[in-house]
Regions:
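Basic, Lys/Arg-enriched alpha-helical interface segments
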Residues: 1-57, 61
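Enriched for short, Lys/Arg-rich terminal
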Residues: 66-95
Length: 95
């Protein structure tokens, strides 16, 4: 697996996180955090089985921690699908 795609929900999560970061920490810090997600997306795509399985919550789903957020994804054929990016919320309620 070497490529990934983001669901609309994951794209909305990224926008929400960035807007929050700008308001709370300023544009420079928010941008650094935002771009760090894409580094993690690449890591996930290159080694998708290296990260924690959360099949106990939803079958086939995995989680990669990025800062204070968790990237929720699944492997679908020859690509990784980024499902959502969540913070400290209850993961069970979001999936």
């Amino acid at each position: 697996v070497e490529n990934y795609e983001l669901t609309e929900s994951a794209k909305e999560d990224l926008i929400r996180i960035h807007h929050y970061g700008v308001a709370r920490f300023g544009i420079s810090q928010a941008d650094k955090y935002y771009y760090n997600f894409f580094t993690h997306f690449e890591l996930i795509a290159s080694n998708p089985y290296s990260f924690e399985s959360i099949s106990y919550i939803k079958e086939g789903y995995r989680r990669c921690v990025c800062g204070i957020d968790s990237i929720i994804y699944k492997i679908s054929g020859n690509k990784v699908v980024i499902i959502s990016i969540i913070g400290r919320q209850d993961i069970d309620q979001l999936l």
